[in-house]
Amino acid sequence: MLQPKRMKFRKMFKGRNRGLANGTEVSFGEFGLKAVGRGRLTARQIESARRAMTRHIKRQGQIWIRVFPDKPITSKPLEVRMGKGKGNVEYWVCQIQPGKVLYEMNGVSEELAREAFALAAAKLPLKTTFVTKTVM
């Protein structure tokens, strides 16, 4: 699963997921899966969607993952009293704003790409849409 190799600080503030997205254009492949809603993706969800797509296209074509989980989420163990510091890092997430391209695909037909992205979208907690590369 995806996570940073090393970080300057182990734990992070919760923060707020506001603002506009970077990476809103399909830049590597022909087709993309774009987030419509706002939320956060865990490393497990990103990997699960990637596996679903890879299996469906039967290893033809190429897939790019355009998001990376770089925010640690902590939690305290069950039945532990309040206080005594922040909990341990449990998993990693990336915050998603509307318009962010999550995955890209190349080397397959549009029909196959749509089916693969539909399988991937079912694994994700966000509303997504299928996009194609715009040629200027």
UniProtKB/Swiss-Prot annotation:
GO terms for biological process: translation. One of its GO terms (molecular function) is tRNA binding. One of its GO terms (cellular component) is cytosolic large ribosomal subunit. Keywords: Ribonucleoprotein, Ribosomal protein, RNA-binding, rRNA-binding, tRNA-binding. InterPro entries: Ribosomal_uL16, Ribosomal_uL16_bact-type, Ribosomal_uL16_CS, Ribosomal_uL16_dom, Ribosomal_uL16_sf. It holds the Pfam family Ribosomal_L16. Gene3D superfamilies: Ribosomal protein L10e/L16. CDD domains: Ribosomal_L16_L10e. Binds 23S rRNA and is also seen to make contacts with the A and possibly P site tRNAs. Belongs to the universal ribosomal protein uL16 family. Part of the 50S ribosomal subunit. This is Large ribosomal subunit protein uL16.
